[in-house]
From Swiss-Prot:
The record marks K27 as: Basic residue of the functional dyad. Has the structural arrangement of an alpha-helix connected to antiparallel beta-sheets by disulfide bonds (CS-alpha/beta). It comes from Centruroides limbatus. The lineage of its organism: Eukaryota, Metazoa, Ecdysozoa, Arthropoda, Chelicerata. This is Potassium channel toxin alpha-KTx 1.4. Belongs to the short scorpion toxin superfamily. Potassium channel inhibitor family. Alpha-KTx 01 subfamily. One of its GO terms (cellular component) is extracellular region. Pfam families: Toxin_2. One of its GO terms (molecular function) is potassium channel regulator activity. The record marks Y36 as: Aromatic residue of the functional dyad. Expressed by the venom gland. Blocks selectively the high conductance calcium-activated (maxi-K) potassium channels.
Protein backbone atom coordinates (compact mmCIF):
# COMPACT_ATOMS: atom_id res chain seq x y z
CA UNK A 1 0.00 0.00 0.00
CA UNK A 2 1.27 3.46 -0.84
CA UNK A 3 1.05 6.07 1.90
CA UNK A 4 1.28 9.83 1.52
CA UNK A 5 4.80 10.15 2.86
CA UNK A 6 7.57 11.49 0.67
CA UNK A 7 10.96 9.85 0.90
CA UNK A 8 14.37 9.58 -0.65
CA UNK A 9 15.57 6.40 1.06
CA UNK A 10 13.62 3.36 2.21
CA UNK A 11 14.53 3.70 5.88
CA UNK A 12 12.51 6.94 6.02
CA UNK A 13 9.43 4.80 5.42
CA UNK A 14 9.90 2.29 8.21
CA UNK A 15 8.38 4.35 11.02
CA UNK A 16 5.48 5.75 8.94
CA UNK A 17 4.74 2.24 7.69
CA UNK A 18 4.79 0.89 11.22
CA UNK A 19 2.22 3.51 12.18
CA UNK A 20 0.10 3.03 9.06
CA UNK A 21 -0.01 -0.73 8.63
CA UNK A 22 1.53 -2.16 11.79
CA UNK A 23 4.73 -3.44 10.18
CA UNK A 24 7.94 -1.61 9.42
CA UNK A 25 8.49 -3.36 6.10
CA UNK A 26 8.47 -0.61 3.51
CA UNK A 27 10.30 0.79 0.53
CA UNK A 28 10.70 4.14 -1.12
CA UNK A 29 9.24 3.97 -4.61
CA UNK A 30 8.87 7.00 -6.85
CA UNK A 31 9.48 9.38 -3.94
CA UNK A 32 6.59 7.85 -2.01
CA UNK A 33 6.56 5.23 0.70
CA UNK A 34 5.17 1.83 -0.10
CA UNK A 35 4.31 -0.38 2.86
CA UNK A 36 4.00 -4.16 2.85
CA UNK A 37 2.29 -5.51 4.54
Amino acid sequence: VFIDVSCSVSKECWAPCKAAVGTDRGKCMGKKCRCYX
